[in-house]
Amino acid sequence: MGEMSKSDRLMAAIRGEAVDRPPVALWRHFPGDDQRPEDLARATVAFQRCYDFDFVKVSPASSFCLRDWGSQDRWTGSMEGTRDYTVHPVQSSDDWRELRLLDPADGALGAQLQCLHLIADELAGEAPFIQTIFNPLSQAKNLVGAERLPVHLRYYPDALRAGLETITETTCRFIAAAREAGIAGVFFAVQHAQYEIFSEEEYSLFGRPYDLRVLEAAQGLWLNVLHLHGTDVMFDLLADYPVQVVNWHDRETWPTLADAKEHFRGAVCGGLQRWDVMVLGTPERVREQAADAIVQTGGERFILGTGCVTPIVAPTSNIHAARAAVEHG
């Protein structure tokens, strides 16, 4: 088989067709750079040019979609490259009803659209790129604080629903604008479909309906990735979401890659443990774990990656090893 383009390779993997090699993609945060669209675009493209992955995940700070509602955050040295929230604008249940619809062309959302256009211009079709979208419940968590979200959900459900409506509509508007920038899909990050946080009934009421409305806004795009964050995830509850790829912490929680293929119709993305292997391991260990993932999946309907963001302290030799692990011979 001749060498396939990145897009053709991914499309074939999603459909379960033969590929010249398994696709591979890692992504990371760029703390500091993620505060300015030009710098985030430059860092994202440089990372891609260094490692030549099959798709590019654009990773802004999670606050990009919240700053215009008053959220504030700062980087305190997290090895994941993520930022800590210092101001939560929702202080009482009444504040959910005060959230206003945002214009995606303005403020922090507009800056992220600028970043996407810069990336599109620089990549010029050499690799598909996808925009991170945090699901409405994840955005709500960062607006009110992680500890208070379950309280509001259980004691002020109508107020929270009002906020989720505004968040959902704003997110759909942003995706519509991001499509114009040339994204191939969205990386849809779901953080609360975990049994240690909510019950299936709670997620079915406060997560799933809003998730599906956001994903409806992304329909027609060909590389939508569902990311299930954390452990003890509600995989089966979300396995029917209209996405082409699912990514989760497969080395840390059920299901395995092989099991997931029995529950999800598209491609599974994972195989590499991000801390013990990508950060603390050696290139040899990376190659061993990648080989195991390929055996688990038969190299079909499979994209090699980490279960979540690659820490910013991962040795470059390990990242190069992950990229090389899918090459034949």
Map each language-model feature to its residues.
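Segments that shape or occlude catalytic/ligand-binding pockets
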Residues: P37-S62, L66
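Active-site loop segments of alpha/beta catalytic cores
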Residues: M1-P31, A43, Y85, D103-G329
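Short active-site-adjacent helix-start/loop capping segments
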Residues: G32-Q35, K57, F64-G77, Q139-A140
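A contiguous, low-structure linker/loop signature
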Residues: F64-A105, L118-D121, G125-F129
